[in-house]
Amino acid sequence: MKRLVVIGLACLLSACQSGFADLLPGQPEKTTDYPTMGADLSDCVYRAAQGMRSPYLFRRKASTNNLEFLVTATGSNAVKPSTLPKLELRFITQGEATTVEMRDTAIGDHELSHDVWSIVDRCAQQVAKPSAAKPIAP
């Protein structure tokens, strides 16, 4: 019985520490660094993507340490999920910057990839911290 508890605890702890890198195989299609926090950027992208007119269902997940976020696009319930590609955006917070990686399946929807990456760029500009803002004299 103790053995099962130890094995179960080890499995639970290893799952909590695992990142999102193993969800879609292969190298990212695109990777870019942005001077913003991952939580803010991923939330902005998720909300904007939900507002798109598309047959995709968008979801947002956070890692247990809140340093990695994942926004996925999959086929909605109305459409067979196997007929639509899957797209993943991985947001990796590194200090005050975030690396964004985009992966999609082999049958990728290039229009979706372009639209979603445009949202990432737009959101990065919206949530970026102003660099060396100077006070305005009265």
Question: Where are the regions that the model predicts?
Answer:
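Mid-chain, structured segments of secreted extracytoplasmic proteins
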Residues: 67-104
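Post-signal-peptide N-terminal segment of Sec-exported extracytoplasmic proteins
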Residues: 31-73, 84-86
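C-terminal partner/receptor-binding element of secreted or periplasmic proteins
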Residues: 101-138
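Sec-dependent signal peptide recognition
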Residues: 2-8
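Extracellular/mature segments of secreted proteins
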Residues: 24-25, 52-54, 129-136
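Processing junctions and N-termini across compartments
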Residues: 10, 38, 98-100, 117
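Sequence contexts marking disulfide-bonded cysteines in secreted/extracellular proteins
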Residues: 17, 43-45, 122-124
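Bacterial Sec signal peptide processing site at the extreme N-terminus
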Residues: 10-31
